[in-house]
């Protein structure tokens, strides 16, 4: 629908893909698609087998992992600074993760600041947001929490 809506307004390009495809029209599908990139075979397909798939260039330094940072099965974007623990998550560009933060099974979009002692699980945090120190956001029983400007939306 969106491609048809903007076809005469914007330059739209696409790739013919034979194996992996996902519609991201719902929050659950968006979450699942991002989490699929934690699988080595999906990353290999898009970034090695199809080397002409590009990301937006933003001349950022590589992610910085400070002493005590722990990252397991996660993707961390350039320009990010990690001071806490990240597990099974996708962290976009220019994200600051404060001291003693824990992020699990979540997607953190661009330009997010997570204050010290923050706990995030099963969440999607919108771009350009600040999550205050000493806060906890958890989606439970398959419910994803979308955090936008410190407002929570359960989906």
Where are these regions (language model features)?
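Left-handed beta-helix
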Residues: 1-155
